[in-house]
Amino acid sequence: MCLAAIVAACTSKPVEQTWVKVEGNKFIAPDGSELVFRGLCFSDPVKLVGEGQWTERYFAEAADWGANVVRFAVHPANINAMGWDATFEAMDQGIEWAKQHGMYVIMDWHSIGNLKDAKYTNPMYNTTLEETFKFWRTVAQRYKDEPTVALYELFNEPTVTGPDTGTCTWDEWKGIQEQIIDTVRTYNPNAVCLCAGFNWAYDLTPVAVAPIERENVAYVSHPYPMKREQPWEEQWEADFGFVADKYPVICTEIGFCLENELGAHIPVISTDVY
């Protein structure tokens, strides 16, 4: 919480690992040690470019906070508005800044809804299976030699319980994620793929009986405070925490707002008890 090796001929020295990888329920750093990711989810790169905030200073501040990973939340509407070439050029620069400050990058296809039925909770998240595969082909090809882009978050928040979000079973969603992973692996066999469950990437209970059948994967949860009533801990364990007994789990979104704060909305409203 990825695997690449260069085999040198005629040598008995250990092979150098340059990528983060999954071993059991842990993320393993290139030096072989366990890696715990602590980081920040950035705003969409296109949004930050437009606001003049996609700068080295922004990344330096994240590193000063103690982050060892940052998340690029790429909204389908934004990449299409700015253009794919310009967006990826901006992300190229961001990756260099992350590397400069000793941080990894999570590449996140930031949609919310039902990819199978192409039903989404807001027009900014509208995409298609074809476009989603295109995005991950582009990422995997462009960054196949860039270990800094260590984690590929395949789909931000799948849900079929929002208004007009269609239907999708776990088996169907599992199959789609496995197809995306296979596409990634065609171009980059090394990146760790992050897989989410339903209920806006909160619920991982189906993993107990039907895990993703691919190697070098980890799971995502977004345990915002209003997903469950207090006390949270036992419910978190039942809903997603148990997965960490066998596989790495990373919370790529987590946090809260006070009820009267700017940005407060369901499901993030809580107090500092959270």
Name these PLM-found stretches.
Residues 39-41, 71, 153, 194:
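Residues embedded in well-ordered beta-strands within globular domains across many folds
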Residues 1-6:
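Bacterial N-terminal signal peptides
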Residues 19, 51, 133-151, 155-274:
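Extracellular glycoside hydrolase catalytic/binding regions
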Residues 44-46, 73-80, 113-115, 158, ...:
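Feature marks short, surface-exposed loop/turn motifs that line or immediately flank catalytic pockets
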Residues 117-138:
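Active-site-adjacent "subsite" loops/lids of carbohydrate-active enzymes
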